Amino acid sequence: CYVAGDRDDAYYHAVIDAYLEEELKLAQWGQFSVLGHLTLPVRCINEMRHKAISFQPHMAQIEEILRTIIPKGIGIECNTNRGNTPLPDADILKLYRSLGGEIITLGSDAHVTNHLGCAIPARQELLRDCGFRYFTTFDRMKPSFQVL
């Protein structure tokens, strides 16, 4: 993820809006099992540009995306983000669950081997705290629910 230069917060929120518009198009298309990296722009902006941008102003867009994928049986990924802030955060995970979302996978975002499986137990606990009882694995695009 690349975010150009040091800009004001309005610029970064415009980047997030554009990203979420594309995520919504992807959700409407719906030919996949799990939507990953839902909150990627915030991670990139906050980590690379040392900002504290929040997804709160974009929750209506997030909710629209979630309301689009849930009836299609599409899940979301809970990414451990290398042990940093989980992606998405607890607010979005709780929203997904409250809307009826059940399919949730765990990813470690391992770009290097020492991040492989990083923080999975902590994210399992987070999922339990957000109301999930299972996480999902797939075999040939068929979901299988594993007890948390």
Name each model feature, range by range:
Residues H50-L148:
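Charged catalytic cores and adjacent phosphate/nucleic-acid-binding surfaces used
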Residues C1-P71:
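Extended substrate/RNA-proximal surfaces in nucleic-acid metabolism proteins
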